Amino acid sequence: HPSLAGWYITEEFHDGSYPVGWQQEPALSMLANYLQTVAAYVKSKSPKEVCIAPALWRGMPADLCGKWFGKIFAQTPDIDVLYLQDIGGRCLVDFDVDLPNWFAEIKKACDANGVIFGVDIESFKECWCPRITMRTKPWTELEEQLRVAGMFTDHITNFSWATFKPGTDTYEGYKKYLEGK
């Protein structure tokens, strides 16, 4: 299947400053150098697309976050695809307000550097304030995430380790939801 034809650098990083952060030099260039070294190496083995999937913590304003990604991509010519984790399962995210602002700025950085912009939606829900333990997310919320991501890209994937497994009624639940619309 075409979606499995390529390389994925698994180390997850984010735009926040916890615990240390990659926002400033020399950490930013150290991260970019690592990503470029790995991407160039795997492409030397097989010249397929290289994908990364960092998390969007919204650790800086959207415009600065876009510039930050631009600085990384300027140093990583062998990175082909970004699947940005939307952090939509972590609460305190307004899909209609927060995500479009960050998606637009990060997509600009991708476009300027020849990187495909994609979104990795979180289809689970787990929050620390208010405390919500890991669970499936309502289909209306998932549909909203897909709609917002679809405003910026056709490259959308799903991240969830708890909600798409046998016994959670995910497939049948979604099918019923769509039939009822």
Would you name each region that the model predicts?
Residues 1-181:
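Glycan-processing catalytic domains of CAZymes
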